[in-house]
From Swiss-Prot:
It comes from Chlamydia muridarum (strain MoPn / Nigg). Pfam families: Ribosomal_L4. This is Large ribosomal subunit protein uL4. Residues 50-72 are annotated as: Disordered. InterPro entries: Ribosomal_uL4, Ribosomal_uL4-like, Ribosomal_uL4_dom_sf. Gene3D superfamilies: 3.40.1370.10. PANTHER family: 50S RIBOSOMAL PROTEIN L4, LARGE RIBOSOMAL SUBUNIT PROTEIN UL4M.
Length: 222
């Protein structure tokens, strides 16, 4: 069992959070790499399409007569050497090239990424009150003070909240979105492995951490 400190909005420790040892079980680094590469690859639209010689709109006349001009003979304006002609061996959306990742592999990769952040001290747990009732109105100055009080490096910070609090955390979300140090604001079940890997620091609510442990550790036992 691993104990993590949780902090209130004043930056003081308000308790401990327990994490099972299974959350820190060893995983395959290659599976993490495959997962991150798949996320990046799937951002592509895979819709690039070009028209070949037989598809472009063109006149059927010869550019000029066959003989007597001194030029090389040409038969069609749709030939690729002419401006507006067809493309040779251009890209075609022949099939869906999206990369699929199994649910178990995805969860194992996210668990390993989060475990690495915890072990390197790049993840802090915030009390649920920080996300729900810490601010009566959006205040960027207060959000920045919270990060400094918790000794969080103000660079590439990712906030993660639990889904149960959607709407009630609006003041905090509006407060942090104007900070250059904040990478994003997301929810536990929508978390993306690439966001975890790219974030330098993660601030996660106690509720979101419970959801993540519940969803990720169950796959380790399978």
């Amino acid at each position: 069992m691993v104990l993590l400190s949780k902090f209130d909005f004043s930056g003081k420790e308000s308790g401990k959070v327990e994490l099972p040892d299974a959350f820190f079980a060893e995983g395959k680094e290659q599976s993490v790499k495959d997962y991150l590469v798949a996320i990046q690859a799937n951002k592509r639209q895979w819709s690039a399409c070009t028209r070949g010689r037989s598809e472009v709109s063109h006149s059927t006349r010869k550019p000029f007569r066959q003989k007597g001009t001194g030029n090389a003979r040409q038969g069609c304006l749709a030939a690729p050497q002419f401006r507006g002609g067809g493309i040779v061996f251009g890209p075609k959306p022949k099939f869906d090239q999206h990369v699929r990742i199994n649910k178990k592999e995805r969860r194992a990769a996210i668990r390993l990424l989060l475990a690495q952040k915890i072990q390197t001290g790049k993840l802090i747990v915030a009390d649920n009150s920080v996300f729900i009732s810490s601010l009566n109105a959006p205040k960027t100055k207060e959000a920045l003070r919270f990060l400094k009080e918790c000794n969080v490096e103000c660079r590439g910070v990712l906030f993660v909240d639990g889904l149960d609090h959607v709407g009630s955390n609006e003041n905090l979300r509006l407060s942090v979105r104007n900070l250059a140090a904040v990478r994003g604001f997301t929810y536990g079940e929508n978390i993306n492995g690439y966001d975890i890997a790219a974030a330098r620091n993660i601030v996660v609510s106690e509720k979101a951490l419970e959801l993540l442990v519940e969803n990720l550790v169950s796959t380790t036992k399978d």
